[in-house]
Design a protein with these regions (language model features):
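Arg/Lys-rich amphipathic alpha helix in sigma70-family domain 2
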Residues: 50-57, 67-86, 101, 153, ...
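C-terminal edge and immediately downstream basic/flexible tail or linker adjoining helix-turn-helix-like DNA-binding
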Residues: 3, 32, 85, 101-102, ...
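The N-cap/first-turn positions of alpha helices
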Residues: 118-119, 148
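Residues within the DNA-recognition helix of helix-turn-helix
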Residues: 19, 150-157
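Structural recognition of an alpha-helix C-terminal capping motif at a helix-to-coil junction
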Residues: 25, 39-46, 50, 59-71
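Pre-recognition alpha-helix immediately N-terminal to the DNA-recognition helix
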Residues: 10, 107-110, 120-121
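Short, charged helix-capping/linker segments at alpha-helix termini
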Residues: 5-14, 24-43, 56, 144, ...
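A short pre-motif secondary-structure segment
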Residues: 122-126
Length: 171
């Protein structure tokens, strides 16, 4: 990290290799479009490279990087909000006797899409990216208590939404 900050391009390429998949997956879960996620990932790493010297605490690199990703994703989402409002109205899940793993993944994705943007992002950062509440608070620029509230409320909603699926899977 320090070598990258000092302008070592090879060291930065190593950082990109280490983080690109996580950043891409995070963006994909937020913007829900593979091409946009790829474009945003490139923008994130370009902005990170350009701003790396301003990073004061190298130990906070991951939170700093995901803050850039957050900003880029929500900038895009604000631009295209009118066209996504209709897409967010997902039809209810069809009943099934038993769900296959792919169907379960789709059900979880659909349930995540029903959460508010704030809740979805907090859950993604906590459950999929493994950040601590304090790190998420830094990324989202809000109090830790707000992050906890968003995560726990979202998990309750997900549990409620996915409970019928779990029941069907036990049959």
């Amino acid at each position: 990290m320090l070598q990258s900050r000092d302008g070592d391009v090879e060291a930065y390429n190593h950082l990109v290799s280490r983080w690109e998949k996580r950043v891409y997956n995070y963006l994909l879960r937020l913007v829900r479009d593979p091409e946009d996620s790829l474009d945003l990932s490139q923008d994130v790493f370009l902005k990170a490279y350009q701003s790396l010297r301003r990073l004061e605490d190298p130990a906070r690199f991951s939170a700093w990087l995901f803050r850039i990703a957050h900003n880029e994703a929500f900038s895009l989402l604000r631009k295209r909000r009118p066209e996504t409002e209709l897409a967010d109205q997902a039809p209810p899940s069809p009943p099934a006797a038993k769900m296959l793993p792919v169907e379960t993944s789709l059900a979880v994705a659909s349930a995540l899409n029903r959460l508010s943007e704030d809740q979805r992002e907090a859950v993604i950062l906590k459950m999929y990216q493994g950040f601590k509440f304090e790190e998420i608070a830094g990324i989202l620029e809000c109090p830790v208590s707000t992050v906890k509230s968003r995560v726990y409320t979202a998990l309750d909603l997900l549990k409620e939404t996915l409970a019928p699926i779990e029941t069907r899977g036990d049959a």
